[in-house]
């Protein structure tokens, strides 16, 4: 069945898979090598602008690859209608399906956030493993910049998620109900819990970071009030109407697991949207305080509270886990279809895995990635790239004539 499905998918996107994908992949790899190995010669020649341009080209190629592969991914979820005419439409129409652009927006913001928090992780590791004062100051600054990027790009992330789900509902409300109120409702609960935790952790880092900035204490009273709002908003965001796997109570389930009627409004989308808006707004205000403090006061880099680097590492891990989890939710939303209502999954694995099983697989993958990344950073510190020392000229005795 999987062989037939892959054959069908490749036949639907022949130009993309046979020409577009390999070309973009090879070009991106080549430009990446140029970017890495051109730094030293361009730096010596004082031509850093060329290196920046190379970096821009590298990002454009990477984004092009991302957008291109979003086509088949969304085609599997929202194939163009009418479905009986699917074999008569062109490849571009299959790529530019209903969910293609919303997923592009969501992944673009998600990958930008991921990039910022990966800088945080690298800066935090290097800070914790550095002995020299100058190195700790530098990597403290790296963590600060990474958090600045990660938080700034993360702010519109909930809005991108709403745009994507709205398009799903417009295409087929059955998919949306399956995600929000049916078998994947508890998956979304975990997603809400993690997003709320990430917003809280980002604000905690800004708080800890501002304690080493002169005259930043003037913002602390407002930030303390903001933390109260963040906790309330995050709690509302991941509060479900019931803890059943489906919309209806199942046999053997305790009816006390349903919110009382006087609190049922907490599970409505009006409350969720208000909570999300509050989370984003408070984080944005704290972000402004953070930026003003760094511009108007002296930052004592290298003297951050020890909690700071560990918060950055947590943010990086949580972001990777969240990206993997959202991919799981999107894939499972097709239910027992390889391509929704076009190509049915008839394999024994067509069932939706449990929350525990999905969490185990996602966590295993994320831990593997994180351990490998940690090992790469550790090797870079343990065995740094050193330049060969130039041989000093030595005096050679001359024979007297």
Spans of features found by a protein language model:
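Hard-cation-handling environments
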Residues: 184-243, 270-275
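Membrane-interface helix-loop-helix modules in multi-pass inner-membrane proteins
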Residues: 1-55, 161-176, 243-255, 259-261, ...
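Hydrophobic alpha-helical transmembrane segments
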Residues: 24-32, 111-119, 194-201, 277-286, ...
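Long, contiguous internal "core" modules enriched in hydrophobic/ aromatic residues
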Residues: 41-89, 94-192
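Short aromatic-rich membrane-water interface segments that cap or initiate transmembrane helices
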Residues: 8-23, 88-110, 177-192, 258-276, ...
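C-terminal amphipathic "assembly/sorting" segment characterized by alternating charged
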Residues: 263-401
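Juxtamembrane membrane-water interface segments of multi-pass membrane proteins
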Residues: 1-6, 34-51, 119-147, 163-172, ...
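Hydrophobic alpha-helical membrane-insertion segments
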Residues: 55-76, 148-162, 224-242, 309-330
